[in-house]
Each structure stands twice: as structure tokens, then as C-alpha cells.
Amino acid sequence: RDKGQMLMLEKRSIGWGINGKSSYVLPCDMINRIIYNSGGYTDTYNKSLDDVWQIHGIDNRYLTSIVCVLQSFKQLFMASDVYVFLSENNNWSEIINSHLGPFGLGSVKHIDTSNGIDEFAVELNANAILIIGKIVGLWERANGKQSVCFIDLTDTGFKIKIESLLSYN
């Protein structure tokens, strides 16, 4: 890492360990194949996911599979025992550096926090969907609330807004 911090990398029988945490290498082509090939499988799609993932700028034929990947990656993080401590000054840059950067998912930038809404920008790259899913998981863990995520695809990346799903929170 660029801050001179050393990470302990170990090869395991299945995958890798980074500082004692299990990690796996996922080929970008695998994620693309999942997104492109699973769009037609809507029989078991939970329609309530449309309430928590609001996506604009992406072709409709890919929305179902993208939402499933987003939700899966968020749930994968939520199933972990990783703590996220958000200070009063919204230290999202530190959270991104410690929870995303070491795993190759650091191409996200915190833009603003106001009125309970956090805004992020994610670069347009092969990991973008994974990054968005995990940042939403980080947000939910840090805030202790279920979220709704608004995703807008632009020419250069994704603009993300995350807020509480429930209006009284």
C-alpha cells in the first residue's frame, strides 16, 4: 500500500489470506459472464430489491443481474464479522482505504455527506459493481440502518447516493 503499511499475504489451499482474512481472485470475465448471461432468469428475482437499488443509465436487460450481483456482494460483506466505525466527521476516506483498498477495490471516492445522504463516485472499471455492493454494505454496517442506493451511470463512472431506506431514520 502507498502508506508504507505492510500486509501479510499467505497462500491457502483455496484462495489467499490477506492479514488473516480469506480472499479470492475473481476474474473480471467471470463477473461479466454472470451479468450478461443471467439477465433472463427473473423467476426467482425478489422484486423488493427494486426498492433498495435504484439504477439509471444502464440497459434494462442487464438490470436484474446487476442488482443480484450488487445485493450478493453487499450480503457477503454483511455476513462477515468486520466492524465499521464511522466518526462524526464522516471519515469515509479512511474506511475506503482500510476496507476496500487492500482488496483492489479502492477506486471509490467520498464526495459529500448532507442530510443523511452520502455521495460517492466510483470509477468506471471492471470492479465497479463489486465496489458499489461493498460500499453499501459498509454504509449499512456503519450506520446500523438498511439503505436505499441510487446509482447513476455517467460517461466516466458511477455516481452513488446512499441513504436510509426508512424515512424516519
Which ranges hold each PLM region?
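N-terminal accessory segment detector
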Residues: 1-126, 153, 157-159, 165-169
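Short, non-transmembrane amphipathic alpha-helical segments
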Residues: 130-144
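Conserved short beta-strand edge segments in small beta-sheet-based binding/regulatory domains
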Residues: 145-150
